[in-house]
Design a protein with these regions (language model features):
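Conserved nucleotide-binding/hydrolysis micro-motifs of P-loop NTPases
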Residues: 17-19, 41-44, 74-78, 102-105, ...
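Residue-level signature of catalytic and energy-coupling elements of molecular machines
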Residues: 1, 24, 39, 58, ...
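Active-site phosphate-binding and catalytic loops of NTP-dependent enzymes
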Residues: 11-14, 80, 153-157, 180-191, ...
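P-loop NTP-binding site
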Residues: 166-274
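Conserved C-terminal guanine-recognition region of P-loop GTPase G domains, centered on the G4
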Residues: 56-125
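Switch I (G2) and immediately adjacent beta-strands of P-loop GTPase domains
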Residues: 16-47, 62-67
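Canonical P-loop GTPase G-domain recognition
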Residues: 94, 103-162
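Single conserved hydrophobic/aromatic residue that forms the stacking wall/gate
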Residues: 2-9, 13
Length: 274
């Protein structure tokens, strides 16, 4: 079970790039060390109260971190997140800049130019050009992270994988399927809330509600004769079964909660506010 969940956590993290709304801790344990990775939402200028909360998650991680890892790629403009990067440039903790997707670069000269632009933007950072797809330079990055870890007793037990409850990853898997099956406006206007999670020895019964902001979005989400929401349910159920290594019974419902991204009571219910 632990091995299955660990593998599932890795899959969720890999597939959820650019879509994380919460601060998620992933824990790596070995006999020699424990690394607590704090994955935060992408940095953006807030348009809703939801995004204000997401920005607070990212800024909170800066305060807590012993090592700051800023992940970008070869196409991102170094001036995209100016205010945030200005703060990163002043950090006293070690900063590692990870430039991903270098497999897309056609020449060494092009890569050197990209690295040079980022070196000027974050002169305090160690730069690691990487390709997660080809696993290039990933081991060197991990080795450097371990070297920078301060001496400390472990924060979590040796069997811990994350600080989030397992039902949290059910919502993440369902949200991923929404992102894959609908145009941008729909998934970014949705929130998933697990209202029932009954785990038995060989099976799990889950009831989840997908919230949207408008009646028109509800119709699009459900689809003609319920075909689209059924497809989402099938895909999500299959991945949840892989995650838990158990038979899963998944029920999905769609509800309208107008302008939920600006309502503090709903943001609190969904875990974005305390």
């Amino acid at each position: 079970r632990d091995r299955s969940v660990s593998r599932g956590l890795g899959d969720v993290y890999k597939r959820q790039a650019q879509t994380t709304r919460h601060r998620i801790m992933g824990i790596v344990n070995t006999p020699e060390y424990q690394i607590v990775f704090s994955d935060t939402p992408g940095v953006l200028k807030p348009k809703y109260k939801l995004q204000e909360s997401m920005l607070e998650f990212s800024e909170g991680a800066l305060t807590d971190a012993d090592v700051l890892i800023y992940v970008t790629d070869v196409v991102e403009d170094p001036e995209k997140n100016k205010d945030f990067l200005d703060r990163v440039a002043k950090e006293s903790v070690p900063v590692l800049l990870v430039i991903n997707k270098i497999d897309l670069v056609k020449s060494n000269e092009e890569l050197e130019a990209i690295v040079d632009r980022w070196r000027k933007r974050l002169p305090n950072a160690e730069i690691f050009p990487t390709s997660a797809m080809e696993h290039f330079n990933v081991d060197n990055l991990k080795k450097r992270i371990v070297e920078l870890l301060p001496p400390s007793p472990p924060f979590f037990g040796k069997d811990a994988l994350t600080d989030k409850p397992m039902r949290f990853f059910v919502t993440e898997i369902i949200r991923e399927k929404l992102l894959l099956n609908y145009d941008k406006e729909i998934p970014y206007s949705t929130e998933v809330l697990v209202e029932k999670f009954e785990e038995k020895e060989k099976s799990i019964h889950i009831m989840a509600v997908i919230y949207v902001e408008r009646d028109s979005q509800k119709g699009i989400l459900i689809g003609k004769g319920g075909e689209k929401i059924k497809k989402v349910g099938i895909q999500a159920r299959q991945d949840i079964e892989t995650f838990f290594d158990k038979k899963v019974y998944l029920e999905l419902f769609v509800k309208v909660e107008k302008d939920w991204r600006n309502k503090e009571n709903k943001l609190r219910q969904f875990g974005y506010l305390e």
